[in-house]
């Protein structure tokens, strides 16, 4: 039987983009990268675990903020090069800016405008154990 991880078309860095969506509303919460280990751990632990390119290590979503993403379903696109994670976003904050979604700006009249409010000050999220 073929290993399910071998079916994925990893990029030259051994990564695949992963889009996290709210499992109830379908809203796109964020995009991050996954490597083979993080995707296998996500499936095993039923929570989103990404690969942080900037830190060069596994990133268990919510490990610092408490805003864990509980996995409900994973999907692979037709080209096998993008993953969608259908998640329950604990705390209703996916973005490090304190917003529900990382996609909080909309293009209007030739400019990017912020349309989603900050739900919690990022300084309060990432200080003294959330």
UniProtKB/Swiss-Prot annotation:
Q: What is this protein called?
A: Phosphoribosyl-AMP cyclohydrolase
Q: What class of enzyme is it?
A: hydrolase
Per the UniProt entry, the signal peptide is: none
The answer on whether this UniProt entry bears the keyword Lyase reads no
Q: Which residues cross the membrane?
A: none
Where is the protein localized?
A: Cytoplasm
> Which superkingdom?
Bacteria
Reactions accelerated catalytically = 1-(5-phospho-beta-D-ribosyl)-5'-AMP + H2O = 1-(5-phospho-beta-D-ribosyl)-5-[(5-phospho-beta-D-ribosylamino)methylideneamino]imidazole-4-carboxamide
Q: What does this protein do?
A: Catalyzes the hydrolysis of the adenine ring of phosphoribosyl-AMP.
The record lists Zn(2+) as bound by 78, 95, 102
List, in alphabetical order, the GO biological process terms annotated in this UniProt record.
L-histidine biosynthetic process
Which family does the UniProt entry place this protein in? Belongs to the PRA-CH family.
Which EC number(s) are documented for this chain? 3.5.4.19
Q: Per the entry, which co-factors are needed?
A: Mg(2+); Zn(2+)
Name its species: Pseudomonas entomophila (strain L48)
User: Pathway involvement?
Assistant: Amino-acid biosynthesis; L-histidine biosynthesis; L-histidine from 5-phospho-alpha-D-ribose 1-diphosphate: step 3/9
Molecular function GO labels: magnesium ion binding; phosphoribosyl-AMP cyclohydrolase activity; zinc ion binding
State the free-text cofactor note: Binds 1 Mg(2+) ion per subunit.
InterPro entries linked: PRA-CH (IPR026660), PRib_AMP_CycHydrolase_dom (IPR002496), PRib_AMP_CycHydrolase_sf (IPR038019)
Q: Which GO terms describe its cellular component?
A: cytoplasm
Q: How does it assemble?
A: Homodimer.
Kindly state which keywords UniProt assigns to this record, in alphabetical order: Amino-acid biosynthesis, Cytoplasm, Histidine biosynthesis, Hydrolase, Magnesium, Metal-binding, Zinc
């Amino acid at each position: 039987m073929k290993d399910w991880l071998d079916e994925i078309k990893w990029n030259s860095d051994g990564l695949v983009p992963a889009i996290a969506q709210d499992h109830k509303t379908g809203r796109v919460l964020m995009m991050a990268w996954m490597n083979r280990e993080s995707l296998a751990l996500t499936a095993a632990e039923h929570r989103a675990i990404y690969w942080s390119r900037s830190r060069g290590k596994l990133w268990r979503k919510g490990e610092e903020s408490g805003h864990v993403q509980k996995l409900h379903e994973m999907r692979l696109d037709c080209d096998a090069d993008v993953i969608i994670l259908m998640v329950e976003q604990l705390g209703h904050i996916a973005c490090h800016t304190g917003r529900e979604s990382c996609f909080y700006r909309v293009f209007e009249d030739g400019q990017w405008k912020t349309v989603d409010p900050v739900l919690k000050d990022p300084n309060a999220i990432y200080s003294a154990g959330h």
